[in-house]
Amino acid sequence: NGSGTSTILGVAKAAAAAKAKGMGSKRSILFMLVSGEEKGLLGSKYYVNHPLFPLENAVANINVDMVGRIDQKYTGNPNYVYVIGADRLSTELHKINEAANDKYSNLILDYTYNDENDPNRFYYRSDHYNFAKKGIPAVFFFNGTHADYHMISDTVEKINFEKMEKIGRLIFHTVWELANRDKRIEVDVTAGE
């Protein structure tokens, strides 16, 4: 997940730069990279069971996994990202992400994989899910699968860096809004709704 990792590091760098200019966020932001996803979400599972900070203090989890490629559905149009889970626990998280997109990125936010009936079940297959199981609102940003998915042929020269930057901008502004709101977002959706 080089594209997701790089994007997270870019968002962290932007947050640190804002803080250095005296414009830091109201809330702390924990940037975390975990491993073991393909073996059963092991890194995130370990963290939620052994957190460095009390989980009740977590406002949201933002998961960035594979955001630099283009899937078959969007061949010729890299201006999209699949958004999964933002509305599963908090309607506010969903609205914040959409508002950030409208203002800063103008991407197509595709909710295909957010559908409970989607056979891929991506919502349950990436690291945000361990946080969601603990009642922490989560959103997963994803570019979809491609011919090199889980292959050694998935190499850096195939990354669309302009697309990745736009997604990173969306993620930064979503995170920044979450970290600077007067009140925490509310968990207002129950499982199965």
What would you call each of these model-derived segments?
Residues 34-140:
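Metal-dependent peptidase/peptidase-like ectodomains
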Residues 4, 25-30, 64-66, 100-103, ...:
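Active/binding-pocket-proximal capping segment
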Residues 18-24, 107-115, 181-190:
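Surface-exposed patches in mature extracellular/periplasmic domains of secreted proteins
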Residues 7, 11-23, 44, 48, ...:
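C-terminal soluble interaction/assembly domains
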Residues 1-40, 171:
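Alpha-helical metal-binding/catalytic segments enriched in His/Glu/Asp
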Residues 2-6, 23, 38-42, 87-91, ...:
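Soluble non-cytosolic domains of exported or imported proteins
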Residues 6, 13, 142, 146-193:
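His/Asp/Glu-rich mid-to-C-terminal helical/loop segments that flank catalytic regions of hydrolases
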Residues 10-20, 49-53, 98-106, 132-136, ...:
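Sec-exported extracytoplasmic/periplasmic mature domains
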